[in-house]
Design a protein with these regions (language model features):
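Nucleotide donor/acceptor-binding cores
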Residues: 6, 60, 139
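N-terminal beta1-alpha1 ligand-phosphate binding loop
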Residues: 6-26, 37-39
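Amide-donor transfer/coupling interface in amidating biosynthetic enzymes
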Residues: 10, 53, 116, 130-243
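Short glycine-/acidic-enriched loop or helix-start segments at secondary-structure transitions
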Residues: 20-21, 73-75, 107-110, 152-153, ...
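Flexible gly/pro-rich beta->alpha loop and the following alpha-helix that scaffold active-site loops
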Residues: 27, 31-98
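Catalytic nucleophile loop
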Residues: 88-114
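Short, electropositive alpha-helical surface patch
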Residues: 116-122
């Protein structure tokens, strides 16, 4: 019999928050990439809805991606955010999880940390200092978030910016606050959806963000591959917790 290919499931918590560079890196690492749409485009302005999530045990890795909403929103916690938290608890017994921005905050909230509004947002390319560069390369990573987490009990912080925690490891779960997946194409989708002027309010322009991304994205793409390699070898490769 041939070798069974590992499967990674990317959860589209927002219709414009897709896997981009991160999906390419998982394919390069030998994974079949699958996706699941949590909030479809037609519900983006009314995102509270019940969702029946796939069985997490059918996958080797779950990747909950970003979203424009706060994970602590009451209407969302009563619907799909709460349902996704249940999925993550079930998955954590034997499946590796990589949470991205909103997805990382969801993991913090799921496993006993807190998520609240940060004193100031981080939007653009920020220097991230890593305490474990073989697992999580430091350097300039893209940010677009207004909230921040406190660590869940037992979690190990792996990275920070000057103002916020950026990554933690908890068993076979790795949470990231930044966006390793961003390339110019994905950024343009986000900028096209910037209806309320979040970028201008942060003191930047769309052109400035595009220019920064043109400068930093190629180096970030190389670090994304290293990040996925470290995640696959160090986190996915960990023994599952005993039942």
């Amino acid at each position: 019999m041939g070798r069974v290919t590992a499967k990674a499931l990317f959860l589209y918590n927002d219709p414009i928050a897709t896997e981009a560079l991160l999906g390419e890196a998982f394919v390069d690492a030998g994974f079949d990439v699958h996706t699941f749409e949590v909030v479809p485009a037609e519900r983006a302005h009314f995102p509270a809805r019940d969702v029946t999530f796939p069985d997490p045990t059918n996958y080797d890795v779950l990747v909950p991606l970003g979203a424009r909403w706060p994970v602590y929103d009451d209407a969302l916690r009563r619907t799909w955010v709460g349902e996704q938290m249940t999925m993550m608890r079930r998955a954590a017994a034997g499946i590796a999880i990589l949470g991205i921005c909103f997805g990382g905050q969801l993991l913090a909230q799921t496993f006993g940390g807190t998520v609240t509004r940060a004193p100031s947002p981080e939007i653009g390319w920020y220097d991230v200092e890593s305490t474990d560069p073989l697992l999580l390369p430091g350097g300039r990573w893209f940010q677009w978030h207004y909230d921040s987490w406190t660590l869940p009990p037992g979690a190990i912080e792996l990275a920070r910016t000057a103002t916020a925690s950026q990554a933690f490891l908890l068993g076979r779960t790795l949470a990231l606050q930044f966006h390793p997946e961003v390339d110019l194409e994905l950024l343009d989708r986000w900028l096209a959806d910037d209806e309320v002027g979040e970028i201008a309010a942060s003191g930047l322009s769309h052109d400035e963000l595009r220019s920064q991304t043109s400068i930093f994205a190629d180096d970030a793409a190389n670090r994304v591959r290293r990040l996925v390699h470290g995640f696959v070898t160090r986190v996915v490769g960990q023994p599952c917790p005993s039942s």
